[in-house]
UniProtKB/Swiss-Prot annotation:
SUPFAM superfamilies: ATPase domain of HSP90 chaperone/DNA topoisomerase II/histidine kinase, HSP90 C-terminal domain, Ribosomal protein S5 domain 2-like. Residues 560-634 are annotated as: C. The keyword Chaperone applies. This is Chaperone protein HtpG. Molecular chaperone. Has ATPase activity. The lineage of its organism: Bacteria, Pseudomonadati, Pseudomonadota, Gammaproteobacteria, Lysobacterales. It holds the Pfam family HSP90. GO terms for molecular function: ATP binding; ATP hydrolysis activity; ATP-dependent protein folding chaperone; unfolded protein binding. PANTHER family: HEAT SHOCK PROTEIN 90 FAMILY MEMBER. Its main location: cytoplasm. Residues 343-559 are annotated as: B. InterPro entries: HATPase_C_sf (IPR036890), Heat_shock_protein_90_CS (IPR019805), HSP90_C (IPR037196), Hsp90_fam (IPR001404), Hsp90_N (IPR020575), Ribosomal_Su5_D2-typ_SF (IPR020568).
């Protein structure tokens, strides 16, 4: 029996206690996933040993043959997962098995929805896969020794998943980690060779090192060898090194789940081998849903980097631009050195060339998804659309390609769904239309009936409706598409070009001239709150509207700056009025200057509200409105 020393009983971190209760009582509907998670962790431990052994070959301790072994004991009701990877020290065991970084568990708990299937999918993504052992086990024992430490510095960690764990020092001659699961009553079916082989084949066939189980011997006991014979139950070859023609969709899907720590299937993938001046293989995936921290600055992003099939690092961010941070996968290069570091990856012709090619490959994959599977692309857009909208600012070379992948709401579709591509929009341009019109706002509901759209509805011209907070910033970089300029319909003096006939333009000029006196009176009433007064060519039904000055920030950008605590440049709107509206005609006829001032102010405030802005002095607006209502009801 192994002698234990320095035994301690320690409590789990609070969040881990909550997590264990969820695991044990409610979370997994698909219990067999525990084996996938533990085998995946064992494979990561082997990768880490390979990487550290590049600099310190003595860590291999004379045995470089890495493997994972899965065993079971029907009588004892146990399942054992054993690896000879990097292993853990006592401090590692307390740190990794007794606590989880706050960004992991706390956020995991916050994102639980109560839907077992959805919640189970979160496990690997949040790095809490080890605790899935408690779904089928009422006790878990972990024996481990970190490579490079003496045999006497092994560690035994044990817990029943009830809020605390024991840890002790033990002798462990072999490096690596052995996890023994003591199965609960009713979970004995997992202590079976065929069951375990089936699960491993299903979830772990792609793992790049052998997963071994004892050979099954049927017949007389005398025929069984004295020492157990082990055989690999998986292919044990890196999936990306195999020819595409030999790989089934299901294998790609399971590999994705391993590299992305995601239990759902990817929407698309692209597997390519590049030969010639540069040699590398890439396998890229588009996930089916966004991680919880997609927009966190320190979120996990980047590809797994291998050099000549040796794992080098997770989250190599240098091979894809930030706006494609959701792409998962691996890149295996023959042109980088085995001792490559993150610093070396920061720049250089090899990395730059690979980044350019992988970016194009990713965008091609999205184009194909949009063309061949529009429903799946709609799912992609709901999850990652706002990240892709960062592209035109970050990647000038691919701006037009990215623009073609963007989706917006528009006046063409009354559902408000972001389903309109720019190519679709260009294909529906009205005769004589040489500009692409858009309007930004907080929500589809807020801008779908905006007064700014009135003239476009009258003429049957489609307008894009941009409602994401990033959109106004996006349009400052995306100035044209397919050779046609974008025009914000709420900005400047609207010129419809050929969409207005010469007769229309002449009539507009005459009306504007005839209303110069009224414009001067309204300007005097509104004072410095407006930059300019003019007759509107935008309005057909509303009395007035506020337009944004040509060089001024729009409402979205002002709100973004305010929210981030930055100074907002001062700007004043342009007040446009509809000379044919009955309210404006009554205003023109009003001789009482106080009443004229009140009416002008109410129209100004209503125009601000219609534009989605807030009032500087809502109490004054209500007071004036009440005064006018009293006069009307007298």
């Amino acid at each position: 029996m192994t002698v234990e020393t320095d035994k301690q009983t320690l409590g789990f971190q609070t969040e881990v206690k909550q997590l264990l209760q969820l695991m044990i009582h409610s979370l997994y509907s698909n219990k067999e996933i525990f084996l996938r998670e533990l085998v995946s962790n064992a494979a990561d431990a082997a990768d880490k040993l390979r990487f550290e052994a590049l600099v310190k070959p003595e860590l291999l301790e004379g045995s470089g043959e890495l493997r994972i072994r899965v065993d079971y004991d029907k009588d004892a009701r146990t399942v054992t997962i054993d690896d000879n990877g990097i292993g853990m020290s006592r401090e590692d065991a307390v740190s990794h098995l007794g606590t989880i970084a706050k960004s992991g568990t706390a956020d995991f708990l916050k994102h639980l929805s109560g839907d077992q299937k959805k919640d189970a999918n979160l496990i690997g993504q949040f790095g809490v896969g080890f605790y899935s052992a408690f779904i089928v086990a009422d006790q878990v024992d972990v024996y481990s020794r970190r490579a490079g430490l003496p045999a006497s510095e092994g560690v035994h960690w044990s817990s029943r998943g009830e809020g605390e764990f024991e840890i002790a020092s033990v002798d462990k001659p072999e490096r690596g980690t052995r996890i023994v699961l003591h199965l609960k009553e009713g979970e004995e079916s997992f202590a079976d060779g065929w069951t375990l082989r089936g699960i491993l084949k299903k979830y772990s066939d792609h793992i790049g090192l052998p997963i071994e189980m004892r050979k099954e011997h049927y017949g007389e006991a005398a025929d069984k060898p004295a020492e157990p014979e082990w055989e690999a139950v998986n292919r044990a070859s890196a999936l990306w090194t195999r020819p595409k023609s030999e790989i089934k969709d299901e294998e790609y899907q399971e590999f994705y789940k391993h590299v992305a720590h995601d239990a759902g299937n990817p929407l698309a993938w692209s597997h390519n081998k590049v030969e010639g001046k540069l040699e590398y293989t890439s396998l890229l995936f588009v996930p089916g849903r966004a991680p919880f921290d997609l927009y966190h600055r320190d979120s996990a992003k980047g590809l797994k980097l291998y050099v000549q099939r040796v794992f080098i690092m997770d989250q190599a961010e240098q091979f894809l631009p930030l706006y494609l941070r959701f792409i998962k996968g691996v890149v295996d290069s023959s042109d980088l050195s085995l001792n490559v570091s993150r610093e070396i990856l920061q720049s250089g012709p090899v990395v730059d060339s690979m980044k350019s090619a992988l970016t194009k490959r990713s965008l091609d994959m999205l184009e194909k998804l949009a063309k061949d599977k529009p429903d799946d692309y709609a799912t992609f857009w709901r999850n990652f659309g706002q990240a892709l909208k960062e592209g035109p600012a970050e990647d000038y070379a691919n701006r037009e390609k990215i623009a073609g992948l963007l989706r917006f709401s528009s006046t063409h579709d009354t559902t408000g769904a972001q389903s309109v591509g720019l190519a679709d929009y260009v294909g529906r341009l009205a005769d004589g239309q040489d500009k692409l019109y858009y309007l930004t706002g907080e929500s589809y509901a807020q801008i779908k009936d905006s007064p700014h759209l009135e003239v476009f509805r009258k003429k049957g011209i489609e307008v894009l409706l941009l409602t994401d907070r990033i959109d106004e910033w996006l349009m400052s970089y995306l100035t044209e598409f397919d050779g046609k300029s974008f025009v914000d319909v709420a900005r400047g003096d609207l010129d419809l070009g050929k969409l207005d006939s010469e007769e229309d333009k002449k009539a507009q000029e005459e009306v504007a001239k005839s209303k110069e006196g009224l414009a001067s009176r309204i300007k005097a009433a509104l004072g410095d709150d407006v930059a300019e007064l003019r007759v509107s060519h935008r309005l057909t039904d509303s009395p007035a509207i506020l337009a944004i000055g040509q060089g001024d920030l729009g409402l979205q950008m002002r709100q973004l700056l305010e929210a981030s605590g930055q100074a907002v440049p001062e700007s004043k709107p342009v007040f446009e009025f509809n000379p044919t509206h009955p309210l404006i005609e009554k205003l023109d006829a009003e001789q009482d200057m106080d009443r004229f001032g009140d009416l002008s102010r109410v129209l100004f405030d209503q125009a601000a509200l219609a534009a989605g802005d807030s009032l500087k002095d809502p109490a004054a607006y209500v007071r004036r409105l009440n005064k006018l209502l009293l006069e009307l009801s007298a």
